[in-house]
Amino acid sequence: MLFFNSILNDAPSSWALYFQDGASPSYLGVTHLNDYLMFYLTFIFIGVIYAICKAVIEYNYNSHPIAAKYTTHGSIVEFIWTLIPALILILVALPSFKLLYLLDEVQKPSMTVKAIGRQWFWTYELNDFVTNENEPVSFDSYMVPEEDLEEGSLRQLEVDNRLVLPIDTRIRLILTSGDVIHSWAVPSLGIKCDCIPGRLNQVSLSIDREGLFYGQCSELCGVLHSSMPIVVQGVSLEDFLAWLEENS
């Protein structure tokens, strides 16, 4: 599994066997929780399959006709199969709740980005920065049609205006919608948050390395739902300031 994912993969790829390569603390928390749960699920799967096979093979009517006819319950067995799942649920719930609350916490952000979902494109507003006309920096991001793609670009994932953000910076991402419900999701950043009309949701974002990170709207929002890709470009602070200067 690790062999097939040794190269950085910030976008979906064919025959992938694991998550995309992450670039944020949120992503690391999600993958660690997944690996933690898979450890317990493996033993649960083996135990359940073993119990079913043993019951079918050894405890059928032909092998034990009297027990099959007169045994109706076993108090010890019922106690065990109630206690063990309860303990497993506790072991699963504790780290899950911890991660859930950590993902909801936004700690002293250095900048705020507002993403507005629309049919069928995204609008981004960087209200901490203004243009030469003293207006907040904002732009729309549309999917690039297949016939206009440059060589090496990803089909149905490339956009005309990428969301450029500095790395190693605490960012507050505010999400809403201008029409129907959308969902802003970038797997390699560990973020998926609904964009609901009339409501502001917020998540914390911090990018660990430079690169391009691809995502899509993950809430069915109409006939062109598949035409709402997201591209986040992580750059150094110097390059981000240069991009701001160019787009002001």
UniProtKB/Swiss-Prot annotation:
Record GO terms (molecular function): copper ion binding; cytochrome-c oxidase activity
List of residues binding Cu cation A1: H182, C217, C221, M228
Free-text cofactor note: Binds a dinuclear copper A center per subunit.
Cofactor(s) demanded: Cu cation
Family matches, as InterPro entries: CcO_II, CcO_II-like_C, CcO_II_C, Copper_CuA, Cupredoxin, Cyt_c_oxidase_su2, Cyt_c_oxidase_su2_TM_dom, Cyt_c_oxidase_su2_TM_sf
Keyword annotations: Copper, Electron transport, Magnesium, Membrane, Metal-binding, Mitochondrion, Mitochondrion inner membrane, Respiratory chain, Translocase, Transmembrane, Transmembrane helix, Transport
PROSITE patterns: COX2, COX2_CUA, COX2_TM
A Pfam family assignment: COX2_TM
Subcellular location: Mitochondrion inner membrane
Membrane topology (Mitochondrial matrix): 58-75
First-level EC class: translocase
Annotated TM spans: 37-57, 76-100
Recorded GO CC terms: mitochondrial inner membrane; mitochondrial membrane; respiratory chain complex IV
Catalyses which reaction(s): 4 Fe(II)-[cytochrome c] + O2 + 8 H(+)(in) = 4 Fe(III)-[cytochrome c] + 2 H2O + 4 H(+)(out)
Regions of this protein lying in the Mitochondrial intermembrane compartment: 1-36, 101-248
Binding site for Mg(2+): E219
GO biological process, one term: ATP synthesis coupled electron transport
NCBIfam families hit by this protein: CoxB
Record's subunit section: Component of the cytochrome c oxidase (complex IV, CIV), a multisubunit enzyme composed of a catalytic core of 3 subunits and several supernumerary subunits. The complex exists as a monomer or a dimer and forms supercomplexes (SCs) in the inner mitochondrial membrane with ubiquinol-cytochrome c oxidoreductase (cytochrome b-c1 complex, complex III, CIII).
Family named by the database record: Belongs to the cytochrome c oxidase subunit 2 family.
PANTHER family: CYTOCHROME C OXIDASE SUBUNIT 2, CYTOCHROME C OXIDASE, SUBUNIT II
Record-given protein name: Cytochrome c oxidase subunit 2
Origin species: Schizosaccharomyces pombe (strain 972 / ATCC 24843) (Fission yeast)
